[in-house]
């Protein structure tokens, strides 16, 4: 299971501040896309291009520009670019 915390408008869009994905291994971009698919909105307003991903080890990145594997047991935080500093 991969535990994902959704900050700002991402949590509002998804309808939950925390989501558990029943996957053993995923690419970080796939995590963002999976969360987008959970949103009832036609255009959730966050993508792999405008979302910071913070993984267990403290590395923050934009998944469209970096390849990063997320594994079972990892905690991930999705942060919108417009997060207020």
Where are these regions (language model features)?
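Ubiquitin-like/PB1-type beta-grasp interaction modules and other compact soluble beta-rich domains
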Residues: 1-84
């Amino acid at each position: 299971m991969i535990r994902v915390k959704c900050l700002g408008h991402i949590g509002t869009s998804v309808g939950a501040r925390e989501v558990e994905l029943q996957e053993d291994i995923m690419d970080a971009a796939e995590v963002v896309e999976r969360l987008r698919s959970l949103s009832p909105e036609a255009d959730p307003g966050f993508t792999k291009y405008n979302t910071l991903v913070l993984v267990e080890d403290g590395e923050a990145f934009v998944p469209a520009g970096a390849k990063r594997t997320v594994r079972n047991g990892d905690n991930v935080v999705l942060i919108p670019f417009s997060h207020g500093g």
